[in-house]
Amino acid sequence: MDSSTAALATASAKLDAVAQQGSSSWIGFFANIILGIISLVYSILYSVLKLTTFSIPSLLYTLFSTSLTVTMNATTLMLIIVLVFSLVSWFVRYRYLNMYSRLPPEPQRKEPDVDLFPDTHPGGSKPGLSNYLDEFLSAIKIFGYLERPVFHELTRSMQTRKLIAGETFNLEEEKGFCMVVDGLVEIFVKSARTGQHPVGESCSIDSDGSDEHEEYQAGNQRYQLLTEVHNGAPMSSLFSIMSLFTEDIKLRHGGDEGGEPTSATETYTSSRYGLGNDFSDQRESTVSVPTTPQLERSSSHGPTLHDGDANPSMGGRVPASIPPMSLDPPLQSRPKRPTTSRHATTSVHPDIIARATVDTTIAIIPASAFRRLIQIYPKYTAHIVHVILSRFQRVTLATAYNYLGLTSEVLHIEKSMIDNATCQLPNFLRGDALTRLKEKFNHERERIGEKDCTKGIALHNSSTGRRRKSTASLRKEAALQAITHGQRPSSVTASPPLQPRESGNKHTSNSGDLLMNIQLSRNGGRRSTSNMDPLTRQSTLLGSLETEVVSPLSQRTSNPFETRRHAHISLNKRETRDEDGLFRESILECMFKAIGLTANGTGAREPDSADASPRLTSYDQIRRGGYSSHNAFGFIDPYGGSVDGDADSITSGGTGPGLPVNPHALAHDMRDEVEIVFFPSGSVLVEQGERNPGLYYVVDGFLDVCMSAADESSGDILKASKNESSLNIGPGNQQGSAGRDRFMDANLGQSSSRKRASNVRRNVALIKPGGLAGYVGSISSHRSFIDVVAKTDVYVGFLPRQSLERIVDRYPIVLLTMAKRLTNLLPKLILHIDFALEWLQVNAGEVIFHGGEESEAIYIVLNGRLRLVEDRQEGGVDVRGEFGQGESIGELEVLTESARSGTLHAIRNTELVKFPRTLFNSLAQEHPNITIKISKIIASRMRKVVDDPSTFVGKEGALKASLNKSSSTLNLRTVAILPVTSGVPVVEFGNRLMGALTQVGTPNGATSLSQSAILNHLGRHAFNKMGKLKLSQYLADLEEKYGLVMYVADTNVNSPWTQTCITQADCILLVGLAEGSPEIGEYERFMLGMKSTARKVLVLLHADRYAEPGLTRSWLRNRMWINGGHHHVQMAFRTQSVPINPTAKRTGPSLKERVQILQAEIQKYTSRKVRHSPFYSPDAPFKGDFHRLARRLCGKSVGLVLGGGGARGLAHIGIIRAMEESGIPIDIVGGTSIGSFVGALYARHADVVPIFGLSKKFAGRMASVWRFALDLTYPSASYTTGHEFNRGIFKTFGKAQIEDFWLEFYCNTTNISKSRQEIHTSGYAWRYVRASMSLAGLLPPLCDEGSMLLDGGYIDNLTVSHMKSLGVDIIFAVDVGSLDDDVPQAYGDTLSGLWAFVNRWNPLSSTPNPPTLAEIQARLAYVSSVDALERAKMTPGCVYMRPPIDEYGTLEFGRFDEIVQVGYKYGLEFLQKLRDEGALPVVEETEAKKALRRTMAPRRASI
């Protein structure tokens, strides 16, 4: 053994040595590898051969040759079969048929939080120099947009003054413009209760003596606190500034100028308020304008001033021979204008003093700065006056008229303005000429009939179309000629001096023919015009541009006006149209004279010299070509322009107050703008609440200035004296039970035009021949406070508003004259109200007040939108309301002196009127009856709260998010259409939506704005600073004129127009392509960067009327800022690969853009894409998606609420079919129980045909006894498992989500975990429909995020209240619930169960059966639902329907066809009955056809 072991060891050692030697070389290494591979292959081949040839055959032989015997009894066999069946059933039941439970989780979308800007000034204003500048700039915002030169001119002589605490400051003596820069100033007004009560016995509103700080006594005179002026607010009122600008403006012009209406105003004011002699004397001195030297000179027409009229302080340096409003040539040497006050002027605000509460710094812009501004920048002076007049109309007059009930005062202003704006036609047009004019209209009246005469008959003017057609080309030609002759100076001294004409000539009847009389009356104006070269006339007057190339007939008409050599032409040799032209021309001259546009007084003050002004001279040198755009109405000059557009906007483009105008030449050249119109007696020329179509001049007949008698029901607020007619209107009573507190009712003229036509009107004033109608409203572009009705057959001259606006823009004297008249005609009360009212301009996101703060003012929205939010206890905020134009906020808190209930912030840039509490207290003490109007507003608001059923469930968490959606959809004034990304056809979308809005009929109409429309309006100011002001004013005017303004963002994402669309929007429609990428687009990023807090709505455009399940959720998942819902809209479109309006480049489009355009064009002809037909197309226009969206924006949506009732709810299908056949659109659907099932089907398909088949299939499943029996389980929570029920609903809806439904849908459930109602608007449809149908006991509650949901009918079986809270106007509510058995019970104090059982089966018993335990539980569950049903029936705008389905049981789904037919027949009969009675609330969707009563659209007379 040892020897063998040794041998093996020796052999192994040898082998190791050999291996070591082999491994030391590469050859040995590779040899070992090869040998190993060969050995492995050999082993594998051997194993395979052995397995196939020996092992497998041996195993098969053994298996087949073996015998197996299995012995099993019947019990074991049955157990095996049951086990296999159970396994298969479990797989089918819980793995195959239970797919609905394995859907990916899609929880309900949470209501997005409201976007709020961070409060940048939580602790008040910050000190320092920057604060000083900010407060100063905010104070002078009242002047509008101030350009740099004007700002410097105003501020270079500004003074500051320190007031210590308690120091008084007499504003009556201060002639400049005062503002508070730092501190607090109280403004007091002299109390009319002087001597009525001893000191300390004041008539206080409160009982706690809080008015002690609101009164101030100086000697025996008591003062009442009017307002408090904080940092950045002006101490002077609007009329303080206007009085400075209009010191030298005459109230009336010409020979018919009478005395100032001092006595009338004084008598009216004294009798109105019982004012003492103190006020009368001050008003007398205020209105007594002839004490001013310049006005004395202007009205006297004499060569010199009276010596006694000169102010001694002026040292006799005022030139006696040069009136400030003269067109005479300037003298060679003119004295320098003194810097001191030129004359003592009584303050516009008497009886007013200021007292500093703390140490205060005030800034004063002296009156001399404003006088200097008039001379240097006359055009901008008129702009400031226009801004002030506009704000006075919108702030003071509108508030006094509609909010305080001061109707008499406002209408007295209208009457006084009518008395001052009169001018008689020349006598030569009063006799035979007027008779011939009437004959022309009489022939036309006989031809067309009396019925069409109410529209008005306009005299035909053949040259109107030719003039308008050639205007643009003539302007270009004149501009080119002006550039060619550019060396001619543009100052007025280039022409010979104009001779002043005799004012009395026009009213003197001279011998001779007609033209002699005309020439004698116009000997001055046309002579100077004829002496000018043609080019001068082209650059001075628009009409001369137009008459250079007109027909010879028109030239022949204008020739007699130039020289006397044509005076011998007889009238009978002229054509009749020349006489019509004379009428038009004379009417225009009278209009010009009445509004202050005369040759002897065309401005506030004549400048020293147009050539000597260093600013004008330097400006003329800067201009290239030397051509100044002095056409009459400031038309856009297509060729001439200034180097500096901003300077051009200030110093040129208009005839300043000191530059002369020839009204005769202007009237001759503009005569084609005038229409001579006949109105029969009773015709309405101007309606209250609408914008004046133009200016009416009464040629013959009488016009009544009226108010609707229906507006007088509120009575006289301030108790006018017995000898004075009551003129108060009270439009608040017309606002209905809804109580929307609009002090500027935009619907007034449109919605109630037919009603007002039939109402009895109360006469306010009479306009006689020579008077003007629509004077104030036309010039100020504000809505009319009055009706103008033809008292007799009347012949009027009509100047359209567009033409009048050009005159006002060109000649500032028109505005200044009206401002002068207003400042001298206003009652004292209106002046004090104007002083206390504060105009605020709030930036987007700025907080007006916080919750819990003291209520110190009422806010009225002039323009913009506000949102009131309330903090949640668990964090975040809830929206309590949104307030648009004309609505007021905070009356209840101010009257009750309670803290603010929430935080108010601006959604966008907003203009507000701040009505301070101190003013309200002052008015209440001086005139206690003035509080009646505000009390009515608060009472109507409280009535709305009581009547609104949603307030009863307002504290429940389910409805907090939607309680105030009604306020978000009501009173929308601006809507922006913003694409998600480039390539979305927003222009086509906007055009279709605009068409739908027109057909739906928005109040006051709607308009659409695009970049091109804005550029056309801005003209040459589109790219300078003045354009910003013009744009903001233009947009504000559009919001007042139209009920809805739509902004279409049709430019690139970074363009200013896109930014404007976002900042101006109350609601932003984000339009995207449903089939496109749901990623956030560049426009959305830009919108988010601007931090807009406007309500945002997503609109998805579909090629087909179908939305894939889950598509909408993919869009909404990343857009938490969508807080206004979403809409699905079908619109055929072609995707654009280039921007909508690509920016034009100087070098032309890039190569890439050209290729894209060519590809798009080629693809239109080469694409072979098969377009599938839409799933469903609406067969009626009222069902169109754009109409549905339009109704939603206008607050005219139609809602359908379907109640629960089991199988009885199948009648909903028939009623929906009847509504479709009756032409009633359905925009929003809500349902409970079976109503949620039928409503969800209709909301998904928006058609009755699909819901019929799907509902019948579901009813068949519910009627199957076997399915019900197989679903039974141990009744621990319910009798069934709910699987069959779930399966039936899931097979109907599949994976569809509520967001994918074509119509807006919601359903309600009862959350028994939190004991409240839940509203579901997102998530899987089948889950929440099933939860809404879960009858307790029959089905188990549905678990949703830890809460158990049951049938929503337990709390509210007819969700009308929630539908109303969504902002729906008309609601059709269908109730199919079972009727409660209210038979009186008398079974005693105890009840035997055995007796009850016997009595139930005893046919001879007359005792009613007592309710069972199940019936008692069911009635207990539906207690709250019964109360909600009664409130729903009383909801305004709700149409309650209950078909006769009481005979059908809750589970009788097998009678499907019968129940549907019952609902269909009932629906047809019910709707037909409403239509026959005229009570069908849905208005036909046709364009509004209104009777044309104005002059531009009547039937013209054939002459």
From Swiss-Prot:
Residues 47-71 are lumenal. Its EC number is 3.1.1.5. Residues 1-25, 93-1503 are cytoplasmic. Gene3D superfamilies: Cytosolic phospholipase A2 catalytic domain, Jelly Rolls. Its main location: endoplasmic reticulum. It holds the Pfam family cNMP_binding. Inhibited by organophosphorus esters. A nucleoside 3',5'-cyclic phosphate 2 binds at residues 821-941. Residues 1200-1364 form the PNPLA domain. It comes from the Eukaryota. The chain crosses the membrane at residues 26-46, 72-92. A motif (DGA/G) lies at residues 1351-1353. InterPro entries: Acyl_Trfase/lysoPLipase, cNMP-bd_dom, cNMP-bd_dom_sf, LysoPLipase_patatin_CS, NTE, NTE1_P-loop_dom, PNPLA_dom, RmlC-like_jellyroll. A motif (GXSXG) lies at residues 1231-1235. Residues 252-348, 454-561, 722-745 are annotated as: Disordered. Residues 262-272, 285-302, 487-496, 506-542, 552-561, 723-737 have a biased composition (Polar residues). Belongs to the NTE family. This is Lysophospholipase NTE1. It comes from Pyricularia oryzae (strain 70-15 / ATCC MYA-4617 / FGSC 8958).
